[in-house]
């Protein structure tokens, strides 16, 4: 970490915006719905100005017209999220720590799988931590850690320490981004916002309701190396 370049918050936020705009294009294009299935730090390419592009479409999947759902009503307008049609899969693809748990359990792929992965990516960017960490008791997911700190009103402890001393540190903006991440990683895909809704939240064009805290976690990380962190690529 000592020899790694610290990316200031403003640059990290620009990366976030670049990625979500990419997902809006992929998930909500008029030409069809592309689900990337492997949104994670190592699949985000940065140039010298920290502009970001989504890369590695090796396991991406195109949802057919019959399985897509398009609706003008947003999740917040009615209070009840609209249905999200799915494509059934027998083979689960992705990276442990970023795979939508509902996709793993039900084996039905929706574009909300990318939103879940994006939520974990947000937590990576805010915290500088791996998606899965080795601790004395075994493996701890970043998702579990974030929810634990949220429930204990200690969310400030999630923030990447070097960020605090960097120019442009904005605590309220970072915490707002974390709240958006919590909505993206809701266990039920129908509770997650769409990519365009996430973009509006990040742009402060849409309110962020209080996220629902899950009662428990079901993911099995026993076969994961947990080696994919936001800062490891710098």
Predicted regions and their residues:
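Conserved catalytic-loop aspartate of Hanks-type protein kinases
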Residues: 114
